[in-house]
């Protein structure tokens, strides 16, 4: 794959044979950021589990202390008092049948987080084929099927991120923007990694195989998986 001159210059700063500690890795990610826009800093964690087995799934949510720097668009499926609660908490879209119809008929998914009250799941369940592949389906495990709508909306807006394994046993998660600076990014990174470690299933051996930190356009920087925090 051909990479541009700026990428190649940035990549020269990274020792591909070295496993960095988290602070060094984030510092280097900032130094190798060269895009004209405010790049997102991402963490990619490869785990020693088999995602094909239900008892080895790793997923959860965590509120990053400094947010993600992204304007999070929240949709809530609710009626009556819970719909009002969602609106007052700052949800961008609130509704029931009409929103289900819009998603079903138009394939509309211009939102980042989808929350529902438990009584709405019979209706929302019809949207599995649209919302499921995009990771938007409300789920009790991730706190997005709940009666505490206000809390869920506020956490989503504040920078709650959901992490889950992909088919290759890797978790991909943003921890903020380059403009955050090293200290805020490091705090977000440690909060995320702590949550992933706590979500460990009963698998034997070394849990974390590899950790890579990178900006949107920059090179990957490897973190020592034996010292993830």
From Swiss-Prot:
GO BP terms, alphabetized: regulation of translation; translation
CDD domains: Ribosomal_L1
MF-aspect GO terms: rRNA binding; structural constituent of ribosome; tRNA binding
Keywords for this protein: Repressor, Ribonucleoprotein, Ribosomal protein, RNA-binding, rRNA-binding, Translation regulation, tRNA-binding
Disulfide bond annotation, renumbered to this chain: none
Entry-linked InterPro entries: Ribosom_uL1_bac-type, Ribosomal_uL1, Ribosomal_uL1-like, Ribosomal_uL1/biogenesis, Ribosomal_uL1_3-a/b-sand, Ribosomal_uL1_CS
GO CC aspect terms: large ribosomal subunit
Pfam families tied to this protein: Ribosomal_L1
UniProt cross-references to PROSITE patterns, sorted A to Z: RIBOSOMAL_L1
Family: Belongs to the universal ribosomal protein uL1 family.
NCBIfam families registered for this protein in UniProt: rplA_bact
Function recorded in the entry: Binds directly to 23S rRNA. The L1 stalk is quite mobile in the ribosome, and is involved in E site tRNA release.
Subunit: Part of the 50S ribosomal subunit.
Protein name: Large ribosomal subunit protein uL1
Organism: Caldicellulosiruptor saccharolyticus (strain ATCC 43494 / DSM 8903 / Tp8T 6331)
Organism ancestry: Bacteria, Bacillati, Bacillota, Bacillota incertae sedis, Caldicellulosiruptorales
């Amino acid at each position: 794959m051909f990479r541009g001159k700026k990428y190649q210059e940035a990549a020269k700063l990274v020792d591909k044979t070295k496993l960095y500690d988290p602070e060094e890795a984030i510092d280097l990610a900032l130094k190798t950021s060269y895009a004209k826009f405010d790049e997102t800093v991402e963490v990619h964690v490869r785990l020693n589990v088999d995602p094909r087995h239900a008892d080895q799934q790793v997923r959860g949510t965590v509120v990053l202390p400094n947010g993600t720097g992204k304007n999070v668009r929240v949709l809530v499926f609710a009626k009556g008092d819970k719909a009002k609660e969602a609106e007052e908490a700052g949800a961008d879209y609130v509704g029931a049948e009409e929103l289900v119809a819009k998603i079903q008929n138009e394939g509309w998914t211009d939102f980042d987080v989808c929350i529902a009250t438990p009584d709405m799941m019979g209706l929302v369940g019809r949207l599995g084929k649209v919302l499921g592949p995009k990771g938007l389906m409300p789920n009790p495990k991730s706190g997005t099927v709940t009666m505490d709508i206000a809390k869920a909306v506020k956490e989503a807006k504040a920078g709650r991120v959901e992490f889950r394994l992909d088919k290759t046993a890797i978790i991909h998660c943003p921890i903020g923007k380059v403009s955050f600076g090293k200290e805020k990014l490091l705090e977000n990174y440690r909060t995320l990694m702590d949550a992933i470690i706590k979500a460990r299933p009963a698998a034997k051996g070394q849990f974390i195989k590899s950790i890579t930190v990178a900006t949107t356009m920059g090179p990957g920087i490897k973190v020592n998986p034996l010292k993830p925090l």
